[in-house]
């Protein structure tokens, strides 16, 4: 079992899953990794993003990633597809640039010092995961935004939960906290 990251498949008349060209296009730059690799990817993105996020929409991106916690939801039960992130058309260009900075920060091991007591991510695997994630992020366009994703995601949260109650951070890892706490602490 593992996790595949790509552009998700909306189906519908314009892009039926049975259409081989549609399938090939959307899987062109897909990234497959074992469950442990997905957990490491989320952890290092959360560590980097926790230090880089400034705007509300950037912080929302980090809370969304922190919610992709396989320890809490089960192996393989995370959604890391690029177009599933809570994109906001009004901030798309700056949020995409932010996510590319988060990836670069993870490459530079931003925040990894907080992992010393737990583990040291495998540099070779991390490079492969970050390179693949960057390719997918670079492919993301405003046209790929699913307008309902942000609204549905926000509506799913209660007023006393992140991201609606603000953006609390873990005092140990400086990562944004999701519903189930710090992704890095609980992984």
Which residues are covered by each model-predicted region?
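Short Cys/His-rich metal-coordination motifs, predominantly Zn2+-binding knuckles/fingers
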Residues: 173, 185
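Extended alpha-helical interaction scaffolds used for oligomerization/partner binding
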Residues: 47-161
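Non-catalytic protein-protein interaction scaffold segments in large eukaryotic complex-forming proteins
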Residues: 1-84
């Amino acid at each position: 079992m593992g996790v595949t990251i790509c552009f998700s498949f909306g189906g519908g008349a314009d892009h039926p899953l049975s259409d081989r060209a549609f399938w090939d296009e959307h899987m062109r730059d897909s990234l497959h990794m074992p469950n442990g690799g997905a957990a490491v990817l989320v952890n290092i993105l959360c560590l980097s993003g926790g230090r880089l996020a400034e705007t509300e929409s950037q912080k929302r991106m980090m809370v969304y990633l922190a919610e992709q916690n396989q320890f809490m939801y089960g192996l393989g039960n995370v959604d890391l597809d690029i177009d599933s992130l809570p994109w906001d058309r009004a901030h798309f260009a700056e949020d995409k640039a932010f996510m590319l900075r988060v990836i670069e920060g993870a490459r530079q091991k931003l925040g990894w010092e907080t992992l010393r007591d737990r583990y040291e991510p495998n540099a070779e695997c991390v490079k492969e995961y970050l390179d693949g994630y960057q390719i997918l992020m670079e492919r993301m366009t405003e046209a790929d935004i699913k307008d309902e994703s942000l609204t549905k995601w926000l509506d799913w949260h209660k007023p006393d939960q992140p991201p609606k109650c603000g953006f609390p951070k873990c005092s140990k890892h400086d990562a944004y906290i999701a519903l189930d706490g710090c992704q890095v602490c609980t992984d």
